[in-house]
């Protein structure tokens, strides 16, 4: 992913085009999520070795192997059916200008220091961690919410897909809003919409299916608005840092954001498991037909709704107060 994200920064210096490329990437990523959400539980049911539960090692292993093989095939198709096209500058002046914008190469430690001095890169990196932490919370929480709050695994498909389909749909219109209001405004609006979705589901979730779908659609729209802008904002933040320090941080900058995303996913998964264990979750109770303790239901509700809402609210305040990358980039470009 690091080379892929880096190419978005290198393909064009146009802020709108960067945002548009990031939005397209998110559209197809979301489409993949919809496919997985629609087939995951079905595949577990097909490959389970138990008549009492679908959550067996055999079922998870075979299901994940199928997804991994599909990913490898698609990756090979991408590699062998695409080509980098590099065009040199037509004039010396243009070449000098591009070199100045690209910055100079530096050692690893010097590049790291340049990144840490770039407050906008730090903010988008932290925001990426938060968003991916939240995504894994409700991605894992979908299964547990259906089983231990709704007590009906048949609800899983619409619970998961109401988020993914809304996310997928909204990203077809976000480029228009981005062109009019800018990436930062759309990203922040997405966080507000996402937060309202989590808050509404926390307060009214479980009342009726329609109400839950409405708030899940809000979550999906928020994730789509923020996610569609994220890669473009990373590219802008790296460009800002390069102009400010004169050091090329494209590779390491994108690597840092990618690492933050993976840490968010990994830590979110671990926190979810630790919290459930702390609440008294015991998987063997399901096989015996015994209900989980009430504390488990309470913890699932907190992890699925309240924790994401709290994290979004904090991140939104940070963005509003400290993130002004687009404004500062325009000032720097006007002064050149």
Predicted segments with their positions:
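Residue-level signature of mid-helix packing/kink "hotspots" within the transmembrane helices
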Residues: 34, 164-172, 266
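Juxtamembrane helix-start elements in MFS-like secondary transporters
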Residues: 60, 152-160, 208, 297
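Transmembrane alpha-helix termini and helix-breaking/packing motifs in multi-pass membrane transporters
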Residues: 33-57, 265-296
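C-terminal ends and interior cores of transmembrane alpha-helices
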Residues: 193-207
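Intracellular loop-helix junctions on the cytosolic face of multi-pass helical membrane proteins
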Residues: 4-143, 147-153, 300-303, 308-336
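Loop-to-transmembrane helix entry/capping segments in MFS-fold secondary transporters
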Residues: 15-24, 153-154, 241-260
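Helix-to-loop junctions at the C-terminal end of transmembrane segments
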Residues: 170-183
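Hydrophobic core of transmembrane alpha-helices in multi-pass small-molecule transporters
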Residues: 1-3, 209-229, 233
